[in-house]
């Protein structure tokens, strides 16, 4: 097969390996890069290059993550792998590495283990939309019935957390044997790559989604009106279009009468651009930082939601002591802090630094939000936690 040259024109998809410690996530990551490089071109990455993951900071939290890239004939993949369980928890909650799909690695020799379950649950909570299963170490299991049993257990576990367990692709392989160049097991890596291509749909690009701009600043320009500035998070805003100002106070409808970037006038502002948007007839006092400018009807303000949260450890600069129900920190969404109270799950009395926990939050002012929105938890401007909206309640 000819090596095809790498082209930026291929669609790009973000994936990652999840699963229990020592089930072979990093070995599989190395095997994918090695087998695909050999088959389709690209560069292989050795196990130890992936395993000593560099530290990164996301929302003030230190996370160890390895990033690798590989190609199939159809797509370009960016793939994340984390060395430790805590890194996965932090990564998934902060959204440091947003996944369009995940590869759940389960050792056939062990079957599903506690972190297998925890990663599936986290995937559900933080909005990982698709999971593909790689049953690893199958070369070490001679009994076909045992493999059937493990596969069934994994499918049931996925279904328990509202993933389509019965329809999930399950590939039986051996990452180590594939990495060693054994053709029978290399074929299973190609099968996994084909499952990634066919089972994970092409993610919607930010530019194709409804317009949203988190407001960072508000100015009044005499004779022209009010200008709000910020970076367009998604979609496009065109001059002459109606927009809504959502959050904190009652939603207001207005019209975009101008877009400018670097003092130049434009017809539109697009996802990723820092722009100023001129609003017709809107008073300076009607708008504030922390609100969003959005396509009418595309996003609503909410005050109560269920969330999945990671609380920084003392070493990470977090709290030194646990907190209890009735805790009232600030929740930082996009560009502003809003005070809120928390409700802990049944049977959870307190939360220790370094824990992750599911909690219900009640904000004192509404924020424009959808499921999947990330936030920081702060005390007096210092970050003490990170979270994600798992489900809007009201």
UniProtKB/Swiss-Prot annotation:
Stated EC number for the protein is 3.6.5.3
Cited Gene3D superfamilies: P-loop containing nucleotide triphosphate hydrolases (3.40.50.300), Translation factors (2.40.30.10)
What's its top-level EC category?
Answer: hydrolase
Residue stretches making up the tr-type G domain: 10-204
Entry keyword Protein biosynthesis: yes
Say what the protein does. Answer: GTP hydrolase that promotes the GTP-dependent binding of aminoacyl-tRNA to the A-site of ribosomes during protein biosynthesis.
Which family is this protein grouped under? Belongs to the TRAFAC class translation factor GTPase superfamily. Classic translation factor GTPase family. EF-Tu/EF-1A subfamily.
Family annotation (HAMAP family): EF_Tu_B (MF_00118_B)
Protein name per its UniProtKB record: Elongation factor Tu-B
Q: Which gene encodes it?
A: tufB
């Amino acid at each position: 097969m000819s090596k095809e040259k790498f082209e930026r024109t291929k669609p790009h998809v973000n994936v990652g390996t999840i699963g229990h410690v020592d089930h072979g996530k990093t070995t599989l990551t190395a095997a994918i890069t090695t087998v695909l490089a050999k088959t389709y071109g690209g560069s292989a990455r050795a196990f130890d290059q992936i395993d000593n993951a560099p530290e990164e900071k996301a929302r003030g939290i230190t996370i160890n993550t390895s990033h690798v890239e590989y190609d199939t004939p159809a797509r370009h993949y960016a793939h994340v792998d984390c060395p430790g369980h805590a890194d996965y928890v932090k990564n998934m909650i902060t959204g440091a590495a947003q996944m369009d799909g995940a590869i759940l690695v389960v050792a056939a020799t062990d079957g599903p283990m506690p972190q297998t379950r925890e990663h599936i649950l986290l995937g559900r909570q933080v909005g990982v939309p698709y999971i593909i299963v790689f049953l690893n170490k199958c070369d070490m299991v001679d009994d076909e019935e045992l493999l059937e049993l493990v596969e069934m257990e994994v499918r049931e576990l996925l279904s328990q957390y509202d993933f389509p367990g019965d329809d999930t692709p399950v590939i039986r392989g051996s990452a180590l044997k594939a990495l060693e160049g054994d053709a029978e097991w290399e074929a299973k890596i190609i099968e996994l790559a084909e499952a990634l291509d066919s089972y994970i749909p092409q993610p919607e690009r930010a530019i194709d989604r409804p317009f949203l701009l988190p407001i960072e600043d508000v100015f009044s320009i005499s004779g022209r009106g009010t200008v709000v500035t910020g970076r367009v998070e998604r979609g496009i805003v065109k001059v002459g279009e109606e927009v809504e100002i959502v959050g904190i106070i009652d939603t207001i409808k207005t019209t975009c009468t101008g877009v400018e970037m670097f003092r130049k006038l434009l017809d539109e502002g697009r996802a990723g651009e820092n722009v100023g948007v001129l609003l017709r007839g809107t008073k300076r006092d009607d708008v504030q930082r922390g609100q969003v400018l959005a396509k009418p009807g595309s996003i609503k303000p909410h005050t109560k939601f269920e969330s999945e949260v990671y609380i920084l450890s003392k070493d990470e600069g977090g709290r030194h002591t646990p907190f209890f129900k009735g805790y009232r920190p600030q929740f930082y969404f996009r560009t502003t802090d809003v005070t809120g109270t928390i409700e802990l799950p049944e049977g959870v009395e307190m939360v220790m630094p370094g824990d992750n926990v599911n909690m219900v939050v009640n904000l004192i002012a509404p924020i424009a939000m959808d499921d999947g929105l990330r936030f920081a938890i702060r005390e007096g401007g210092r970050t003490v936690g990170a979270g994600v909206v798992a489900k809007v309640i009201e």
